[in-house]
UniProtKB/Swiss-Prot annotation:
InterPro entries: TBSV_p22. Interacts with host protein HFI22. Its main location: host cell. This is Movement protein p22. GO terms for molecular function: RNA binding. Belongs to the tombusvirus/aureusvirus movement protein p22 family. It is found in: Host membrane. Keywords: Host membrane, Host-virus interaction, Membrane, Phosphoprotein, RNA-binding, Transport, Viral movement protein. Cell-to-cell movement. Displays RNA-binding activity. One of its GO terms (cellular component) is host cell membrane. One of its GO terms (biological process) is transport of virus in host, cell to cell.
């Protein structure tokens, strides 16, 4: 298998300072390479590749993603690459379940996708099948995404998207409701 996964065990704030999500695909036409930014799935802008003629294929793909989630949250999920030019949003790649409290580094030699060099590159990434040890109901953490386009000095970011989960103590309370003494209260005005 030519796909490698690596998860780096560093605090997220260190990783976040180290790199601000420079997610890029290396595309190839003949002997010529060009980097194309890889966008999050809820960012709708597409990117135009400035090469002349022919088709590009995705190769030497290296993706570095830092979800800003506490390592203590114990949240996992699958990272996917999707073709949004396809009406069904065909999945180009989906990883195994990964710990979202650590940086994800994905390396692939080839991606089964090609597009005309005169068109947009409609590949996005996202997360699915999120698993948490907590029940739904309370805000415990959020995820924020930042990335850069090519060699641009501008940094782009998405607003934080909140995930609702519940503290473990609250989950236990749901399973074992506390016995409350019935007390009468006067509601006289």
């Amino acid at each position: 298998m030519d796909t490698e996964y690596e998860q780096v065990n560093k605090p997220w704030n260190e990783l976040y300072k180290e790199t601000t999500l420079g997610n890029k695909l290396t595309v190839n036409v003949g002997m010529e390479d060009q980097e194309v930014p890889l966008l999050p799935s809820n960012f709708l802008t597409k990117v135009r590749v400035g090469l002349s003629g022919g088709y590009i294929t995705m190769r030497r793909i290296r993706i570095k993603i830092i979800p800003l989630v506490s390592r203590k949250a114990g949240v996992s999920g699958k990272l996917y690459l999707r073709d949004i030019s396809d009406t069904k949003g065909r999945k180009l790649h989906c990883t195994e379940s990964l710990d979202l409290g650590r940086e994800i580094r994905l390396t692939m030699q080839h991606l089964d996708f090609s597009v005309s060099t005169r068109s947009d590159v409609p590949i996005v990434f996202g997360f699915e099948e999120l698993v948490s040890p907590f029940l739904e109901g309370r805000e415990l953490f959020s995820i924020s995404v930042r990335w850069q386009f090519g060699l641009s000095k501008n940094c782009y970011s998405l607003p934080q998207s909140k995930w609702k989960v519940m503290y473990q103590e609250d989950a236990l309370k749901v399973l074992k409701p506390s016995k409350k003494k019935a007390s009468k209260t006067d509601s006289s005005v």
